Amino acid sequence: MKVSWPGENHWQVGPAVVESPAVGAPQVGGLPDVVPEGTLLNMVLKRMHRPRCCSYQLVFEHRRPSCIQGLRWTPLTNSEDSLDFRVSLEQATTEHVHKAGKLLHRHLLATYPTLIRDRKYHLRLYRHCCSGRELVDGILALGLGVHSRSQAVGICQVLLDEGALCHVKHDWTFQDRDAQFYRFPGPEPEPTGTQDVEEELVEAMALLSQRGPDALLTVALRKPPGQRTDEELDLIFEELLHIKAVAHLSNSVKRELAAVLLFEPHSKAGTVLFSQGDKGTSWYIIWKGSVNVVTHGKGLVTTLHEGDDFGQLALVNDAPRAATIILRENNCHFLRVDKQDFNRIIKDVEAKTMRLEEHGKVVLVLERTSQGAGPSRPPTPGRNRYTVMSGTPEKILELLLEAMRPDSSAHDPTETFLSDFLLTHSVFMPSTQLFTALLHHFHVEPADPAGGSEQEHSTYICNKRQQILRLVGRWVALYSPMLHSDPVATSFLQKLSDLVSRDARLSNLLREQYPERRRHHRLENGCGNVSPQTKARNAPVWLPNQEEPLPSSAGAIRVGDKVPYDICRPDHSVLTLHLPVTASVREVMAALAHEDHWTKGQVLVKVNSAGDVVGLQPDARGVATSLGLNERLFVVDPQEVHELTPHPEQLGPTLGSSEMLDLVSAKDLAGQLTDHDWNLFNRIHQVQEHLRDVTTANLERFMRRFNELQYWVATELCLCPVPGSRAQLLRKFIKLAAHLKEQKNLNSFFAVMFGLSNSAISRLAHTWERLPHKVRKLYSALERLLDPSWNHRVYRLALTKLSPPVIPFMPLLLKDVTFIHEGNHTLVENLINFEKMRMMARAVRMLHHCRSHSTAPLSPLRSRVSHIHEDSQGSRISTCSEQSLSTRSPASTWAYVQQLKVIDNQRELSRLSRELEP
């Protein structure tokens, strides 16, 4: 071995490497934490002068020319927490990406032999490469779940970041252009056509697709702040919402940070980021990797990981660095905020912030905002208003009551404030606390009644009570489907009704707020006769009659409802119990105790179609409605759990329904699916996720329907043995997706498209080749809506252009709510983080927007759905559209779409797919 300063002469150290098998080449990323005595590396370090932050090169002889560069010596104490580079997760991920790159390289060469070739550009020859545009075209043409060019660019960026793809000029950003050339490193892979390699390729593309959005985000961060686009700034802001280091900052600060964040990568473990005593100029957030915190005298103090931050004191004062920060692993990425940028942001935000204090404590924080302002949009002069940032629940409610206006429009900021509060109050202000506060405000007198006339005093009280009634009216309209079973709520409403009945002005106001009272009012004005019982009622009716449920809640599962619990025994016999939907496992077991052949000591578990068993905790509730697709409940002795086998019905059908589907046109099938989905979607309440005693069975039922549809598509295609019929069925499913999109049923549209992109279906190359060019072109156009890049930006833009009624892509909406909840603290300095509530309300309000015109037909069959149930003979009359070719009755089709039978075991689908096309 030879040691040298970079660029200088070498000198010999120790015996040759080939004579010391104990050493070998260290893992990429630097020296191990402990160097054994007597090894060659130990002797090298003993003879080398080791000043801080000096780099060396170790050049190995008797091998092909290579060296390890950038080795740094840092005095670290030996610790059990030292990272073992040889088994690091990062290296394992890199290996998977390299393997995926080789598989993709092999498949591209087999499919497009002329893709990789010599290129000549501007009088220069580039050997064995392809252009960025051709590479993206090739990946899209493979049909492996990549639906858009931006998604393919993300995959290529992942390969480029990990070294599985190289730019001929070593640029770090992948560009989808003809004049940018890339090559796969290493020798050309040998062609192979085994089924195992094909499955590995599908898994590899799934891995690359999963990491693609992160790679695109990294590209946006690497750009200089002044070159970032509006979309990139929004993407960075959304990423900041999920970083715990900035969770305490307001959204205004986060938006400003998105414009000044700098990306700082470091490749080698052991690199000193800064040393104790250095001048602090930046704040660091760990985006990837980990660091060790070392101080003089104490050595290793702690280890920081992804999401942690350090150096923030440097932004507050000019104190020197209190510790030394050393990279703990390779390839660490940091988000850096320079002091001058952060101080400017904080100064600007503080200038817009107003704090209200009571008894020496802050109880309300307001921020002056400009309407229309954003991270990349300048504020509009003269359109400033104050919004609530945080506060105590009581002060937020008090401000809301003061800000409400009787003549406000639906788009007024005050109305949005009211909606935000009502949709989220259960998170920070339970209903009992809200009732108490409202009754207190109803009775409260002005602070200084002598300051005005008696008429002004009376007007003030009346106006405030009117605001309370408006708020309660909106609250009742939102929560009315759940209030009949809430004795506390009904008691509060009765108390308020008694108080209102004593004031004629308030009674008249309340009478005009409710449709039932408006009808009575029209009758009393001469439009009809009113019964004496109606005239005798002085107390306003807050809730609709329980016998006349709201249209949106018809058929919804409520807290007190009983649902069937189908419980299997090990011998596959089934026992059905009817229990409350929110019954706990303990209550289910107690009900089973009254049945024969049941012994104490048995447990309740759920089993899926693959035979996987999951135990259920005694306190778990709603297990019947929360079962996944093809899951069943089993009661079994603990020692027999591992012997359980799925019920035969869980395995799915063995024969397809292609003959039946041939009798129904794609348009009419889409109409029936949309009718059924709309019924399920309309039963979901906007706020059921946030209420403690409200079941989520309706939401779970709708989500299970999504999974059912995508596996239904894959099941029917895999169970169609005739190639011609299978191609015809594939064509129908593509047209079905197009009609679902046209009918604005985006949830089922995504489900059908996901089913078509299932690996068991996408591999059926001969079936896809049978499709006409026009149909394949239609499928490619539909795939663009599935593009997940930039946080599903294509879908979100398309959704904003649709007028209601719409059935949105529900999994994405739930993901948004989950990310908002987990990425933001509910309490900030012991105050309610109302910014978080505002974001959650905005996401949940999408449900209301999509259903705001629920009476409009979504499909050609919408107006005839009721007749299907009422009169089976009448339903035989054709209800198809003019262009429909259906010969099957709508009633039988309706029954079919409600009870789809599917195979959800991916291994079984893959097996069937290989039998169709080996």
From Swiss-Prot:
Gene Ontology annotations of biological process type: angiogenesis; associative learning; cellular response to cAMP; establishment of endothelial barrier; negative regulation of syncytium formation by plasma membrane fusion; positive regulation of angiogenesis; positive regulation of GTPase activity; positive regulation of protein export from nucleus
Keyword Oxidoreductase: no
Domain Ras-GEF: 665-884
Molecular-function GO term, any one: cAMP binding
Residues recorded with modification Phosphoserine: S79, S531, S859
UniProt-listed PANTHER family: GUANINE NUCLEOTIDE EXCHANGE FACTOR, RAP GUANINE NUCLEOTIDE EXCHANGE FACTOR 3
Name by which UniProt lists this protein: Rap guanine nucleotide exchange factor 3
Organism: Mus musculus (Mouse)
Underlying gene: Rapgef3
